[in-house]
């Protein structure tokens, strides 16, 4: 019984590979099903080519023997047979790749003429091809869950502190919009680009909030500074940060947005350190509120 089970029952009902198993497990995705179909199609034509070529070779070797066929025949040892056994596999190969050519033609036509509807012949040939099924299958995006979680937690800290740098949005709304954008991307490169942008943007907002908290502390310890301000110190602080960002953009023409964001982060860190170290004697206090 064990021997019979080992010989015949080698295909697992739960689609797990077994020793000496013949054939593939049932496909769980369209991509795997396409791979299995392609395997079967290719081997069908390979067997045809193998049988045809072997028959020609064996026949040629058999008739080449001087005792079997003393008078050479042109069909066996001539140009005709060489042409036939060369052209026949070529036609088979063309027949195999024809759906791929049709798919490439459809893609080129769609790129050159996006408003042109595909013809029925192109549609029927391309829809049945394995390449179309593979290309239409969406590739999963590998998510950086660690960085996403970090961004979410940092936004919650700013929300808990009622930071004015979250554009006045309700709690959870800012992260919800970012998360929706991240989940709607269709390419891995676009996901990384968007995630890096959101991380840099949040770093800038965190730096601005930290500078504002230090600035408020300086004002609380030195009430006379508010009297020197031409208008609201907080509004003056916001205007000062915007002006410095504009100055960075003007002084660094041709720089990428990522590089400009890094320069702004460094500048905000410099402001925070100077306010902490020098307090009301800080150079930036004088620029904000006047001498």
From Swiss-Prot:
The lineage of its organism: Eukaryota, Viridiplantae, Streptophyta, Embryophyta, Tracheophyta. GO terms for biological process: electron transport chain. It is a multi-pass membrane protein. Keywords: Membrane, Mitochondrion, Transmembrane, Transmembrane helix. This is Uncharacterized mitochondrial protein AtMg01280. Its main location: mitochondrion. GO terms for cellular component: mitochondrial membrane. InterPro entries: CcO_II (IPR045187), Cyt_c_oxidase_su2_TM_dom (IPR011759), Cyt_c_oxidase_su2_TM_sf (IPR036257). A stretch of 270 kb of the mitochondrial genome is duplicated within the centromere of chromosome 2 resulting in the duplication of the gene. The expression of this duplicated gene (At2g07695) is not demonstrated. It holds the Pfam family COX2_TM. The keyword Transmembrane helix applies. GO terms for molecular function: cytochrome-c oxidase activity. It is found in: Mitochondrion membrane. Belongs to the cytochrome c oxidase subunit 2 family. The chain crosses the membrane at residues 42-62, 86-106. The keyword Isomerase does not apply. PROSITE patterns: COX2_TM.
